[in-house]
Amino acid sequence: MIGLLPTTAIFLATAPTDLRKAYDGLAVLVRQSLGQDPLSGSLYVFCNRRRDRIKILFWEEGGYWLCARRLEEGTFRWPQTEGACACYRREELLLLLGGIDLKQTQARKWYRRAAEKK
């Protein structure tokens, strides 16, 4: 995706969304339902009721980007959380888009060793 940095905030709308909406309709949902500013540079991810389509709205200098994905088979494993939106990390979004069920995955602890002294 364009401009997806590790520091970019990602918000998933937890309720099903009418994906006939385009730029302006989704921006209104971001303001009213999610309580966020659509011009902040964050990614806002929406899913339809059948969970086979996703739209991602984000603002980049000069205008909105709207990305869409439709699955030919199966569904996205959409999170069931309380509240209007869920905050995700970049890695979690990539797993979700790849069809991975995040409830059945577990992050492993990892670290880098300090440079060995010679």
Regions found by a protein language model. Give the residues of each.
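Polybasic/polar functional segments that serve as interface/processing modules
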Residues: M1-K118
